[in-house]
Amino acid sequence: MQDQQQVIHKAQPWHGKVGLIYGQRQGKTEMQRCFTQAPFRIQRPFYPEGNRVCHTVLLHTAGGIVGGDRLSLDLELKPESHVFLTTAAANKIYRTNGETAQQDGIIHQAPGSILEYFPQEMIIFDGAEYHQSLRVNLAPGAVWCGWEVLRFGRTARGEKFISGNWRGLTEIWQDDELLWGDRQWLPGHPEVFAAWNGLNNQPVVGSLALVGLEISEAQMAELRQTMATIQQGLGGITQLPKGVLCRYRGPSSTEVKRWFISLWQNWRSLYSPQPPTLSRVWQTY
């Protein structure tokens, strides 16, 4: 395995890109433009919920991200389009080869558009150096819903994230107003991994946010009741000026995804008449 990982680290870095444009025509959301550059690929869109919601699966064919990789995602949703975007498998961030891996995303959503962005979990190897950023520009009436699930260290191997750095920045803007900003830095260190205000010896953290619409106190109370269903780990729910933010810290990526899916199923009706349908790549949840 050591030799295999050394080979991975010596490979040439990727400069991958994804560019997608969606539009709605006669009640059907269509992928109107698709540009990919290796290692990314896009599966053919499918419609398990009917024509209104376009399900899209993003593939990273290299199997993981290494130091020096530069990856970018550019999405545009035209008025009234509704897109459900996920990934085919968990992503891996390998131990650094001396360089930092970078992934950046920019999303533009027109009035009335809906994006549900639910990538599968990211596994950050001990010693990884990784930076990511995401900026979402929402027009009035647009809704963004997304999650991030991170596992720090290969837990099954007894590995902890005690060296390296993980940095992330997410910003959701509307009419030059920052609706939600989330800047995080988790340095790999034994004290940070163990500290109660760090990972508290829990390798999995997750964030789920719904941004772009008002959430009433009654709706917030209903959402908070779902925290009682968490069997492993801790959850928290915070009301945003135009949305809601949910956090998890615990031992199980399966547990956090089950909780996040239940929240999404609960609030889907707030912005779409379409009953939620689980993605076919989520069959194990």
From Swiss-Prot:
Its main location: cytoplasm. It comes from Picosynechococcus sp. (strain ATCC 27264 / PCC 7002 / PR-6). The keyword Lyase does not apply. Required for maturation of urease via the functional incorporation of the urease nickel metallocenter. UreD, UreF and UreG form a complex that acts as a GTP-hydrolysis-dependent molecular chaperone, activating the urease apoprotein by helping to assemble the nickel containing metallocenter of UreC. The UreE protein probably delivers the nickel. This is Urease accessory protein UreD. It is found in: Cytoplasm. Keywords: Chaperone, Cytoplasm, Nickel insertion. Belongs to the UreD family. GO terms for molecular function: nickel cation binding. It holds the Pfam family UreD. It comes from the Bacteria. The lineage of its organism: Bacteria, Bacillati, Cyanobacteriota, Cyanophyceae, Oscillatoriophycideae. GO terms for cellular component: cytoplasm.
